Amino acid sequence: MPEVRSSTQSESGMSQWMGKILSIRGAGLTIGVFGLCALIAATSVTLPPEQQLIVAFVCVVIFFIVGHKPSRRSQIFLEVLSGLVSLRYLTWRLTETLSFDTWLQGLLGTMLLVAELYALMMLFLSYFQTIAPLHRAPLPLPPNPDEWPTVDIFVPTYNEELSIVRLTVLGSLGIDWPPEKVRVHILDDGRRPEFAAFAAECGANYIARPTNEHAKAGNLNYAIGHTDGDYILIFDCDHVPTRAFLQLTMGWMVEDPKIALMQTPHHFYSPDPFQRNLSAGYRTPPEGNLFYGVVQDGNDFWDATFFCGSCAILRRTAIEQIGGFATQTVTEDAHTALKMQRLGWSTAYLRIPLAGGLATERLILHIGQRVRWARGMLQIFRIDNPLFGRGLSWGQRLCYLSAMTSFLFAVPRVIFLSSPLAFLFFGQNIIAASPLALLAYAIPHMFHAVGTASKINKGWRYSFWSEVYETTMALFLVRVTIVTLLSPSRGKFNVTDKGGLLEKGYFDLGAVYPNIILGLIMFGGLARGVYELSFGHLDQIAERAYLLNSAWAMLSLIIILAAIAVGRETQQKRNSHRIPATIPVEVANADGSIIVTGVTEDLSMGGAAVKMSWPAKLSGPTPVYIRTVLDGEELILPARIIRAGNGRGIFIWTIDNLQQEFSVIRLVFGRADAWVDWGNYKADRPLLSLMDMVLSVKGLFRSSGDIVHRSSPTKPLAGNALSDDTNNPSRKERVLKGTVKMVSLLALLTFASSAQAASAPRAVAAKAPAHQPEASDLPPLPALLPATSGAAQAGAGDAGANGPGSPTGQPLAADSADALVENAENTSDTATVHNYTLKDLGAAGSITMRGLAPLQGIEFGIPSDQLVTSARLVLSGSMSPNLRPETNSVTMTLNEQYIGTLRPDPAHPTFGPMSFEINPIFFVSGNRLNFNFASGSKGCSDITNDTLWATISQNSQLQITTIALPPRRLLSRLPQPFYDKNVRQHVTVPMVLAQTYDPQILKSAGILASWFGKQTDFLGVTFPVSSTIPQSGNAILIGVADELPTSLGRPQVNGPAVLELPNPSDANATILVVTGRDRDEVITASKGIAFASAPLPTDSHMDVAPVDIAPRKPNDAPSFIAMDHPVRFGDLVTASKLQGTGFTSGVLSVPFRIPPDLYTWRNRPYKMQVRFRSPAGEAKDVEKSRLDVGINEVYLHSYPLRETHGLVGAVLQGVGLARPASGMQVHDLDVPPWTVFGQDQLNFYFDAMPLARGICQSGAANNAFHLGLDPDSTIDFSRAHHIAQMPNLAYMATVGFPFTTYADLSQTAVVLPEHPNAATVGAYLDLMGFMGAATWYPVAGVDIVSADHVSDVADRNLLVISTLATSGEIAPLLSRSSYEVADGHLRTVSHASALDNAIKAVDDPLTAFRDRDSKPQDVDTPLTGGVGAMIEAESPLTAGRTVLALLSSDGAGLNNLLQMLGERKKQANIQGDLVVAHGEDLSSYRTSPVYTIGTLPLWLWPDWYMHNRPVRVLLVGLLGCILIVSVLARALARHATRRFKQLEDERRKS
């Protein structure tokens, strides 16, 4: 007999050490919480598939290592490990795979997800139930039988045959118990006279109630009122008990007065339909063994044993306290136990089968029984939910919840089986994941679920057979499940027929027809997949999708076929089932002389098979007596031997009276050890179990003549009867051959169906459009600024390159002409001639015009202090030979004013150079030069004809002669004359400073430099520095009034002041003087310009009042897009920039800036809502017209210009249930985080195709076609957090991060040499200009120090600008980088150590593997001859702060570095922690240690530290598993100890 496990079993040293720690007060809770947090952290982080494969592989290895040692702690660890893997899968499913494009896809995908959530819930509940089976052992009864209680044995019956019931009754009468203390009652709801007669004959009590109300429960309740025993023992009428039943079970009931129920297993000595009908079923454990062998024993640990309706003892007082057996549901047994436990009663389970019964003979009966169970458990779930109400512990609630919700499996099972059909038939991909991702996440989840269940179930249930059981019943239970949940009162009790015979085998179509239909549909889906894979033209993505779903469909089909195969009923002619038994017997004559001795092989109520050697040839049936001794009692049974030979004899009983029948029952069923081998099956081997399931499918295709006629189960038993591969070496070969045949058959059927599936439509994978929008860069120009290189539409807004506030070209007004004539009278006499090619003006290349894009143009500006006196346009290019001079032309206009017309010459397609004079009066500050292509005749053209085109060469020239206008020195004109916003080119602003370069004066200059940076924005600004006023041109002079150059005449100032004075050496130039009586006033004066809240005065002099500046907050720069709410496009650009005209309107751009240190949980995309309007009517081709959306030259998505709702939408619109599509469309779009950095640009390209091609159309149709983005379109960055891994010079190159985190640079200090030269100061000012352009805010908070005073700003980020002559002073600031500057060279001084490399390789094995052949690059380069270096590292003064050093031996090198920051094309090459610039060449390096800046909410730290780090995920996850297992094992042991403490004490006394 198994003993109760003690909590003080031998443990390993590690376990003992952990036990000592856990014994400390509060340690267990602390360790448990820490372990749970670690486990949650590890499950919350998703990894790329290739990294997840590492986690999966290691977890599989650990599974085999731990699973090799069978122990309770190992099982708990495997369950927790399985939970870790499954929760990682669940996290991945919820966060990475739920991307649906259609409502049908969303519906199907959601259904699959809900089914998976149900499966995971059941998995975890099963782990909870079985985490610590109690293994309860029998307790001895009091030694004096007089102290034993009285027992009433109930045998309820309704319509069963007497031949079945009499076995149970006679077996009950033979139970070893004092006769005066036990009474057997036949509860006959059929009220049959033969049963009453039998009761009188055998000595049982017969009870028949007048009505059949409440079926079995009512029958039992009626009997309770007519009996008075202390306990009630219930047997179903086919369950024959062993004689030791009460002696082995009553000890617990007597010992513990709180136990209301003692349940024992339901063992069936006949095979169930799965064992009998499937070819591999005979070696498979019965379906019910899992529940009685594992689940109930686990329930007992939680004091949640269920009453199963039979083979159980109940305490009468407990039953009477709840008002009798429950009658509200059709499963009175489970509901009765629940009611008793709600009142505080305990239940117990003894895992020793003490009765044997009949399994359902036919599949349809089996299904009917399960339908009743499902209905009853779901009724309890609805009307008496265990999660609610009083009296239950959480352990009991969860165990009951598991039992009830397990019968909800039908709908999820159907969903799992049919899910691949969503893609194979409808092209709906309901899991948005690659096959590699599924392999990395789903397969490990299934492996651990199956493997851990195999370790738990051992030989009680084989892997994959639950799928067959569920599939067999699922389609029958779907309706029952739904109806019962909606209406729990429906349904009635049905009695399961037992003991039937089958004269011949047949196929029970009624039991499997739903699965046949499902199987045919699945086969069609599989055939479709095979056909597409074989003959379809698929891209790689579609091919993988078909392969994955076809494999899924194949697995589903195998399970369905196995379920169908159960319907192949085999014949059953025997009235009595054979029961294997090994009992010594003697065969004697009538006179008592022994003929032969032997050992029985099997027994039944019809006879016995005995191993023996019959001494003589058997001439016919011979009467004999079989004698044996059972438990000290001799049994002599009359029989006849009917066959003998081969060491075996077959006997049949010759029963003449009730006593002889009683003796046979005692021999066959009543032995105390009759069923001890009930669970003696081989341990589960999942792969072999899968092969058995496949082999069972083969039986479905056998002919009627091949049906195996088995009269009884040949169950694998201990000893010689056990089926063993070592005894049957050909078994594996047979399994393999059967598998090969099955696969071949399926392949043949699939191939045969491919011809029929050939005409089926193929799902075509969506592709990105071949044409993707491209963002136009705006290169700086030497004199005039081009505003666009795309299509410039007359009278419309800029198509993509105009910045905010830039004016559009307008026809020249009369008052403008008068003003120009008036100004011309005072102009200088010096004229300047400018020659610009179209490329110089901003054309990306030659300008080509076609019918769909007939209007192309260029925007440029004229400085406001210049007057155009003459101009000429010199053109060259080519025109299509198909053009005709009488109908086709190219017309040039400037600001809507006619310049000239080009006519084609078919004989000479090329033309030019051709010169066109331009009236200088046409020019304004902002100008638009347009080229308009006419491709038709008489107002009609074929705009879609690609053979009609005209091209203007990019080398065509615009020659402009200008003279300077007299200066107008008004502060209100600032930033003119230094920068004219109409002239969009790189700006140069000379700065005049005293040679001492006082830090306060430098700060004032830096404020002004950043203000100019804001004005020039992305154009860039350079500040050449000198100590003297230039001989010509404009300049800014900053200094204390008393220190200003005497050439200015010492202007009188009474405080902070700003003045515009003429350049003493150039009357047409202006000097902007920023001054004050002291250095503080100079700073105030510079702030007066930079922070002016109102327009500056229309005067040349301004006294500045002190300026109050509010402290800045992180990431609040005016240039940065708001991140706490969705931002409208209309707040980023003017509405005109969002509009386009014509079928091809060019690229509409929406630029914005954002801090680059953005981080989202799991790299969740940002949200963008695109709203756009397209004209109604039939002008465009709906199927081909689209809007392409991109960001930073990365394609995101395309949308049709006219929203369509498909067939369903058309039908709904037709009946008036849906509104027709409107011109406004609204689409939500995901923006991947990796596409966003500091300077960003959204690109929108409308590509509208005309409805009719090749047909003459109105020439005005194209220009009348208007498309545009709605200004209420939004982009939302509110889900982003700020954190970044440094060093990363790319952040600096885009928006000056991390220094611009505070827009005024209040957390930044600039480190300059003690005596900087002009080049160093110029580099400083250029850098401040760059910062101002990045933030649109003056750098009023920056501090300037020398290297000797950096300790005063230790808590700030440091910007170091130095030449090699002073490099020694700043060397300590770079101590945390891997570089040093010495002897004019920049060198690498340190690499990671071997230990660091090893740690890095373990932390990120994939990267280490990819970089295994690469070596760190050593840097050794001279910083002379214009070579500059930019180094970024963590500050040695304060952790988390950054040092950025700009180093060179000369000003040219520093200037080169600063110019590099302003060139967008070069920004992409600025990366890592070191950039070396040499002319146009850039080299980036990454060697220095990394560090992190920024903060995250606590819940985001796991994702930040473990994303892309599989080893970290493993370490944290396994640590959590170990800690949780340690705490769980101790807690479970203590719980078991509490459960048994009093009884163990009692046993020790005995």
Curated annotation (Swiss-Prot):
GO terms for molecular function: cellulose synthase (UDP-forming) activity; cyclic-di-GMP binding. Residues 711-734, 768-813 are annotated as: Disordered. GO terms for biological process: cellulose biosynthetic process; UDP-alpha-D-glucose metabolic process. It is found in: Cell inner membrane. The chain crosses the membrane at residues 26-46, 47-67, 106-126, 398-418, 423-443, 468-488, 507-527, 547-567, 1513-1533. It is a multi-pass membrane protein. Substrate binds at D236, D238. Its cofactor is Mg(2+). This is Cellulose synthase 1. The gene is acsAB.
